[in-house]
């Protein structure tokens, strides 16, 4: 392992050495650019574009273009990128991740590769985690690009399609990750090409790249429509599970007895009924066998009610506001407005909390961030913390993490963790340190991992009469303003995880002399990266700073993975004193090994998500490509329609005429022809079922289809109307079947794990079953297109 790390470190150094040489070239242009007038500097943009047209590559232009962008920054923004920012810019242009510490000027770093890549005219997307940051950066950095002659757009969720189209047509477009993904999905649901808003995906720079490509990687973007659902079923299941008792016996216990009705496996957060629980369900609902096929829906409702009541925690996983259940992002602590837990879990939580149950929705289109961002020609990103996830970035996104040196040395003091026996003793110690530091005026930022913890601490500080600001999912609208003031003398700020990320904390007057910003973590996060982000809020640009984490044996991470070893160690040292504190390297090592295990589990889960989603990705690409072919067509879709109808005829005739003639299913064949292709009169007068051969019948039906097509063309004198009719037929059928297929694939994925018990590989089973279901769907699409086209009545009123 040490050798691998050494190799990676050396590779990093080698890459930086190469970048240093390019940075030398950029700096060699500095005086030349400074000597140019504003008009001459601005004229460089059309000059570069002309050189690209003549065959120069962006790499050829890099030193000069970076120098132009740098000089323009000085004149327009009053900011001149440092050498380390040039290095970061080169890493971004190369499609890598620039790991730059907080306060090192990532936003300014991005201006150079954005300018260079925008010269191609193919569009650059600058991606941020929320609309506040998109809007802020578009306003501040947009003036630089506009001065240099580029067009700049902002894409937000409230825009009309026309406004979005204009934003995407710009050289530089600022947007959130979710809006980009949703626009892509919506573009693949339109009926007319001119309704689309995005151009082909060229180059993206993702700010806070770890947050988007790692933390949110498993979050699918979903566009839904309402599905029918009986809400009473959720209430019935909820009432039943509320009566159940947990089986807390050891999983490895030898006895075969149940000690409760349901069992929870906390490391995987799974919950299931015991045999006693299953029997109780049968008695409660009057069933012989809970797991009979006809009880499938009830089992689903019970499973979700169990999760809602015993796994999902209020004010940690979700909040209830104004009679509505809102999801809390476990990484940022923010409320995720408009998002709902899928597969009926949200409805189950609504039943649990006694609020109005909203309709369950049906997925119409879906994609994960992993697969959306992998479609860009070139992808890059910036963050203060990516090195711990380097393997994942390389394997999944083919991006290297390049650690960019700081402009000034880091002098922040990172103190060892302190461990307490209980939550109460830990929070008491945190408040004591806050009191001590607040008394001398030092600003303090306290990081918590849940809304519950932040409110508990806030209540304790109120009792001590210490004024403070609370930043969590319940008031994130003001978070940027609050976080900007967190470095002022006497400020005390409590933040859930990385609320306010992307906004710098600058130190107020006299704060350096007090030791800079003090950061106190009240719990270790399951990811080292999130802890590092919290530490990184302090000690920016060579400022002094202080960080310390407070832990307790009752913390979630310690309970799940800390193990009895730490507890025994603490018991030996603490003499049953709840206020006893331990500061030991063993504790830090134990915590870090627990974090590594969780990170490993999470990476495996994300990798598995990608493997499963790749099955859907291939299918999605086929369907979207077919849709685009239909939408793109300007003349006639006959060349698409006819093969579909011919394949349907072949399939049906072959199916009903298998084996010996005496076994042919002629009634079924006649039913197919009457229901899908021709009138009864035609069938009775034109087809002789006693003497026909399958091949001759196929040819006869092909001719029938051709005649029908020509009749419809004649009825619709305008070719544009015929094209319109063809598009409506194909797209309506494709979209309906695709929506149902997404739902079926989702259900397949939920159930596929059970096949693992039969010594089968669930992924291979999912791939095989998914492929068969897709083939079946294509066949169903062609069948329905055949019937709809042949049986549709033309009324000559088709218009766009």
UniProtKB/Swiss-Prot annotation:
The protein's name is: Protein translocase subunit SecA
Location of the protein in the cell: Cell membrane; Cytoplasm
Q: Name one GO cellular component term.
A: cell envelope Sec protein transport complex
Which domain of life does the protein's organism represent? Bacteria
UniProt record, GO biological process: intracellular protein transmembrane transport; protein import; protein targeting; protein transport by the Sec complex
One Pfam match: SecA_SW
Sections of the chain in a coiled coil = none
Q: Which GO terms describe its molecular function?
A: ATP binding; protein-exporting ATPase activity
**What subunit structure does UniProt give?**
Monomer and homodimer. Part of the essential Sec protein translocation apparatus which comprises SecA, SecYEG and auxiliary proteins SecDF. Other proteins may also be involved.
Keyword Nucleotide-binding: yes or no? yes
Species whose genome carries this gene = Lactobacillus delbrueckii subsp. bulgaricus (strain ATCC 11842 / DSM 20081 / BCRC 10696 / JCM 1002 / NBRC 13953 / NCIMB 11778 / NCTC 12712 / WDCM 00102 / Lb 14)
